[in-house]
Structures are given as structure tokens and as C-alpha cells.
């Protein structure tokens, strides 16, 4: 498994190849088969190799973390504050999406000094679902997957394995 600190460097090195791989998949891959490969590789990394995202935390340090209304309610309740106080203290509007709130600070306000999530049991749905490699319709999300590859070792490893599966060298 690639070192999380080297993921961006390696992804940048392969950016041109990965762009061509995305085009190759769009033209040649069966969407259902590609999803099956994604799901199998996802399961291998997380279950067979027992990968723990909490030891990386690149996503917590670098991404805009979106908060849905149900996430706001859960985290505010856990912290013992009102939703309005939570919004005022921790969130800002996302300039890219109308009516969406994101955590205002990077790294995420809820990481402790050891990089562990202080709200893990109540973490936002966007955090629960990341890296989305076990979701359907991966072919139609390849652009964002490749963007996330810069920071996520799991996505990096899956893309590298997919290149082998599709004989894209």
C-alpha cells in the first residue's frame, strides 16, 4: 500500500496517464463490470488487508467536508450545542454549491492532536462514505475519483490495479 504522504506526488506523476486511462475506460469499459472490479478491490483493501483510513486522515486534512442537515443535528447533539450554534461556530457556505455548508477549517476542526476524529461515531455522511469506491456508477464518476486519488491511498491503489486488469500500461 502506498504511503499516504507520497500519494499526491505519485498521483501527480501519473496524472497524464490517468487522464488517458479515464478516456480509455469511458470508451471500452462495461459499467457493471467496472463497478464489480471497484467493489472487489475496495473489499480487498479494507477487509483482506485490513486498511484503516484513520491512520491516514488525508481527507480530513485536505478536503472540504460537507455537512448535511442530519449531520449537523447529530454532531451538534453530540457536542451538546444547538444546531444554530454549531453552524455559527464550525461551518461556512460552500462557494461552489448553493445551499450547502462545509466545515470552515482545514484540517477538520474535529481532529484531535493525534489526528483522530473526536466525533467519529457522529461523523458526517460524506466522511462515512469516503472513498466511495464501493458505490455504483464508478465509470460516470471517474473524474472526481481521479481528483481524490491525489490524497487517498485507497483510490490510488485501486486505480493502479484497474490499469493492470484492463491491460492499460
Indicate where each model-derived feature is located:
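Short loop/turn segments that flank or connect secondary-structure elements
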Residues: 1-169
Amino acid at each position: 500500500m502506498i504511503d499516504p504522504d507520497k500519494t499526491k506526488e505519485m498521483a501527480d506523476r501519473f496524472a497524464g496517464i490517468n487522464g488517458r486511462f479515464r478516456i480509455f475506460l469511458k470508451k471500452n469499459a462495461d459499467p457493471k463490470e467496472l463497478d464489480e472490479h471497484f467493489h472487489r478491490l475496495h473489499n480487498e483493501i479494507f477487509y483482506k488487508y485490513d486498511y484503516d483510513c484513520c491512520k491516514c486522515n488525508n481527507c480530513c486534512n485536505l478536503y472540504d467536508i460537507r455537512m448535511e442537515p442530519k449531520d449537523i443535528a447529530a454532531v451538534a447533539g453530540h457536542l451538546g450545542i444547538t444546531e444554530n450554534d454549531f453552524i455559527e461556530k464550525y461551518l461556512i457556505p460552500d462557494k461552489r454549491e448553493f445551499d450547502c455548508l462545509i466545515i470552515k477549517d482545514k484540517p477538520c476542526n474535529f481532529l484531535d492532536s493525534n489526528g483522530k476524529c473526536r466525533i467519529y461515531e457522529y461523523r458526517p455522511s460524506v466522511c462515512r462514505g469516503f472513498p466511495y469506491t464501493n458505490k455504483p456508477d464508478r465509470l460516470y464518476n471517474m473524474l472526481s475519483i481521479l481528483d481524490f486519488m491525489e490524497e487517498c491511498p485507497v483510490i490510488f491503489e485501486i486505480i493502479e490495479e484497474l490499469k493492470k486488469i484492463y491491460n492499460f500500461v
